[in-house]
Each structure stands twice: as structure tokens, then as C-alpha cells.
Amino acid sequence: MLLANPIAPDNLLSGSGALVVLAIVLFAECGLLIGFFLPGDTLLFAAGISIATGTITSPLAAYLVVAPIAAVAGNLVGYWIGYTAGPVVFHRPNSRLFRPEYVTRAHEFFERFGSWTIIIGRFVPIVRTVVTVMAGVGRMRFALYTLYSVVGAVLWADGVLLLGHQLGKIQFVRDHKNWIDYLVIVVVILGFVPVAVHYWQGRRR
């Protein structure tokens, strides 16, 4: 009897494990300062395609519920970090993962869009991590912050999932399911490359 290939797409992307991994990545990217370069967009898009092609066997509804919840949970943790320790974090010297230019970029968003930054920034990597902490530092009203976080999480997480799901319904994609599955895995792996590169550059300094 042949052993199953652990790196085959059907094994990597099927079952509840994929949903757990996605939830962890979204939580970290949306709330923890170490989550700057985690490929949340890529994973959401890949999950949508994989659900449509049948590689992921969990129902789409489960992802549409869990993904926004994970993102909002991350936001609330990020707000708490900013509220309790933000000034200390933002005034630290350059570290391998956190740099002043990230704060500057997020601050520019706040200057331009105000509270709407919580929603708009959700679609911008790095910004979606920093603005949550900055909202806590700025003592943004918690109820308003939570409302914007929920709206932004649903629009972003479910929007990208559904976009990938619709693409996965295209006949060409379904006819080349095996190749698409491998392509999805390659794209997801490439999404983690910036993390490794950034960490390596930090170690060289």
C-alpha cells in the first residue's frame, strides 16, 4: 500500500488544518506586531480557489465566518497593545521586524482618512497591522473602533475569499485543477518569502 504524499495539494489544503492555519495567520497579521509580512491576502485568495475546485473540503461558509472573526480578534489585541504599551513600542530603536517608517505610513493614512483608516487600511499590507496599534495609542473610542474593525474584516476577508472562490468556478481553472492546486501552494509559499528576506537583512545589520 502506497503512503500518501504529505506535500500533495489535496493533503496540504484539505481538512480543518487549512482553516486553522488561515485563522492564525489572519490573527497575527491583524493584531501582532510580528505579523507585518504574513501573506493574509494570498492565503484568503488561495483558500477561495481551493474551496471552489474541491481541494479544500470544508464548506465556504466556515471560512466566511472564521476569517473575519480571526481578523477582528487580532484587531482587538492590537488595540490593547497600543492602549497599554504603544508609546514604548513606537519609541524603540529599529528592530528586525518593526521600523519607524511603518508608523509613518500608517499615520499618513490616519491623517488622510481619519477613522475610516480602520476599514481602508485593512486592504493595505503592513498598514492593517500598524493602524490597530495606533488606534489604541490614540485612545480611539473602543465601540467605534470595534464597529469599524468588524465592517473592515468582513469586507476584506470575505471579499478576498469570495473573489478567489469565483475564480475557482471558471471552467479553465476546474479543468486544470491539479496544476492550479500546485500553483496555489507555490503562491502561498512565495508569500512568506518577504518574511525570510526581511529577517535575513535584519540579521546582517
Set out the residue ranges of the language-model regions.
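Transmembrane alpha-helix interface/packing and boundary motifs in multi-pass membrane proteins
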Residues: 23-42
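Membrane-embedded alpha-helical segments of transport systems
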Residues: 43, 73, 151-159
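Transmembrane alpha-helical segments of integral membrane proteins
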Residues: 158-170
